[in-house]
Amino acid sequence: HGVSGHGQHGVHG
């Protein structure tokens, strides 16, 4: 789910 704080995908997808 990406990086904490991004919720959906963030940086890591």
UniProtKB/Swiss-Prot annotation:
Keyword hit for Secreted: yes
Inducing or repressing factors: By bacterial infection.
Secreted among keywords: yes
Localization, UniProt: Secreted
Tissues/organs with expression: Hemolymph.
Keywords from the named record: Antiviral protein, Immunity, Innate immunity, Secreted
GO CC term, one of those recorded: extracellular region
Biological process, per Gene Ontology: innate immune response; regulation of defense response to virus
General function of this protein: Antimicrobial peptide presumably with antiparasitic, antiviral and/or antitumoral activities.
Subunit details: Monomer.
Note: Stimulates antiviral and antitumoral resistance when injected in mice. Enhances natural cytotoxicity of blood and spleen lymphocytes. Induces interferon production in mouse and human.
Protein name in UniProt: Alloferon-1
Native source species: Calliphora vicina
